[in-house]
């Protein structure tokens, strides 16, 4: 498939997903207004840092309850003071040396990934728990950052569109968001079209609408184990 055809296909799928999700947006906007007003907008767009975000909150019960739920999930599932996961080799009884190696790997993962500020895990996972309590779902993203530790982010549900497979499992996520020309250059470098490179040189903060599509390969062979 030619790149232009692939782009056209992605745009068509995004438009279909936007239409499919539209009936839920009014309810999610209500959840934002009354339960999680800091999170952002689905339908009623407001300026960043707007002081009117909390205008509809006439009772703080729901926002406080959601904060308590998120804190409880954080403390029970991913407590920063505990080793909340372990490693093992399926079907293998570990020797003493294997157990020591696995435990040292767990310690390294906690120290260099999950409990270090540069990975953003602690902040991102708390945002995920806030979204789970507010909307019933959330989008947690793990990204490779060359030369740095793995990075974590929780994307705003308003930017994301999902699709289920035949088993009812989400296997496709589309994210529609904005990047400045400067950010695009930082991310993709010289492979960008000359037009965007020129804009970045003159107006680095000009924004572009971007689409991040994660979906199964069309030529995937399900009979292969890998």
Question: Where is each model-derived feature located?
Answer:
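Extended, helix-rich architectural segments
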Residues: 1-225
């Amino acid at each position: 498939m030619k790149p232009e055809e692939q782009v056209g296909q992605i745009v068509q799928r995004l438009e279909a997903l936007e239409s499919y999700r539209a009936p839920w947006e009014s309810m999610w906007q209500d959840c934002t207004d009354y339960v999680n007003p800091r999170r952002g907008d689905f339908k009623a767009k407001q300026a960043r840092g707007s002081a009117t975000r909390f205008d509809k909150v006439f009772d703080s019960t729901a926002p406080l309850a959601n904060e308590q739920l998120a804190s409880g999930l954080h403390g029970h599932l991913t407590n920063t003071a505990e080793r909340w996961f372990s490693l093992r080799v399926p079907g293998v009884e570990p020797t003493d040396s294997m157990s020591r190696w696995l435990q040292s790997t767990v310690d390294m993962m906690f120290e260099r990934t999950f409990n270090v500020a540069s990975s953003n895990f602690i902040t991102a996972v708390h945002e995920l728990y806030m979204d789970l309590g507010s909307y019933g779902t959330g989008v947690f993203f793990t990204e490779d950052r060359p030369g740095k530790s793995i990075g974590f982010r929780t994307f705003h549900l308003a930017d994301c569109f999902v699709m289920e497979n035949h088993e009812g499992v989400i296997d496709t996520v589309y994210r529609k968001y904005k990047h400045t020309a400067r950010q695009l250059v930082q991310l993709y470098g010289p492979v960008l079209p000359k037009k965007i490179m020129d804009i970045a040189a003159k107006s680095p903060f000009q924004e572009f609408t971007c689409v991040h599509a994660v979906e199964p390969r069309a030529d995937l062979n399900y009979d292969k184990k890998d």
